[in-house]
Amino acid sequence: MRVSEVFDGLSCFSLRTLSLALRRPSELRRYISQCLRKYDELVGNGLPCRGPVTPAENLTITIPAYHAGGGMSFDELVILARVTKTLKPRTVFEVGSYNGLTTAVFELNSDPDARIVTLDLPPGTGAGQALIPGDKELVASRHVASVPRALGLSRCTQLLCDSMAFDPSPYLNSVDLGLIDGAHDVAHVQNDTLKMARMMSDHGIVFWHDYGGKGEFKPLASYLESLAKRCPLYRIPDTSLAWAPSRELKAAIWEMRN
């Protein structure tokens, strides 16, 4: 455990924290992480809060009832569904399929002719050395695209490879809605962000998941906050979602690489 994690834990100390540590120690890390994320949000640390869209009053969304844990919360799925329904993307690209829950949300809430593309490691692939411990557990427990199959959905294109080796060339300037939720170490997040920026159209939105975490997720937050110095980048209240408008993100990435 890092010294910074110890200080984070001490900053959340209370009798209830101690009680949880004694009664359900396996839940302590998640509890402290949620407390710290909410504190940062309330006092204005990190990215500013802002919603990505304002849906029309007559819009409805569809969310799968099944949720096996891990990945997105129901609140986060609702946000992605609202954005999909409002933005009406022609192409959606997701890095990090996991069980396909968010893939299903994109397919259920997009137009019938929209293209849904999702990328993940091939089944049976071992977790690489770069992955943080939490990612290694998810890689070991995942069942790629199991949710879309259970729902009878078949419109998505499943790509199977490490995102570090992925060639974005076939999708350049064509993606209207992007989600980065693959490996959460800085090397992968930076790689996925650069490639996503190349694939995005000028009128889209890019999301990142697991922003605001501490411990092993802190480098991800630091990377996004450094990127926010070059382009508008926001957090969504009560979630771990961050987002940026694609035009500004593309311009910032181009400036950084030239």
Model-predicted regions and their roles:
Residues P64-G71, L77-N258:
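S-adenosylmethionine/decaboxylated-SAM
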Residues A56-Y66:
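Conserved adenine-nucleotide phosphate-binding loops and their immediately adjacent elements
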Residues M1-N58, W254, N258:
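Membrane-proximal basic amphipathic "stem/tether" segments
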Residues S11-S14, L22, S26, L36-V43, ...:
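Generic secondary-structure transition motif, activating predominantly at the C-termini of alpha-helices
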